[in-house]
């Protein structure tokens, strides 16, 4: 029952955020993780979970992978808004899950910020990981 409430809270928070003119792609995940920090461990994920990370090229690579997968008849859930932090991934997963906790897709495709990747991996283990590049893109 608690999982149901947490998932519903995420969905409603994101809808309310969008209604008030915000993107609504992160806040629901933040609320859900405050209610249950392990909620992502309780979601039934699809057979394929793909993470894409790197210093640059994440969004383009994710979009390209999405197009390839959908053209091959896979139902894909991915963070097209680019919300690639732990709360953004939580929103993505929970917003696309049934209230029973099953993700509604064949593939979960996640664009991951390289700094937040380790936090996501505490809760979601990808079956595949693509690293676009490793370069210093910020001053030390």
Model-derived features: positions:
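Phosphate-binding loop of NTP-binding sites
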Residues: 4-140
């Amino acid at each position: 029952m608690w999982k149901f409430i947490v998932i519903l809270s995420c969905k409603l928070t994101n809808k309310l955020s969008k209604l008030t003119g915000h993107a609504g792609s992160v806040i629901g995940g933040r609320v859900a993780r405050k209610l249950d920090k392990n909620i992502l461990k309780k979601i039934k994920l699809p057979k394929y979970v793909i993470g894409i990370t790197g210093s640059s090229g994440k969004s383009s690579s994710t979009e390209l992978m999405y197009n390839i997968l959908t053209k091959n008849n896979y139902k894909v859930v991915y963070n097209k808004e680019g919300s690639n932090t732990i709360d953004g991934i939580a929103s993505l997963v929970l917003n696309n899950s049934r209230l029973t906790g099953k993700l509604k897709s064949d593939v979960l495709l996640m664009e991951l910020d390289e700094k937040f990747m380790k936090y996501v991996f505490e809760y979601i283990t990808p079956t595949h990981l693509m690293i676009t590049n490793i370069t210093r893109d910020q001053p030390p």
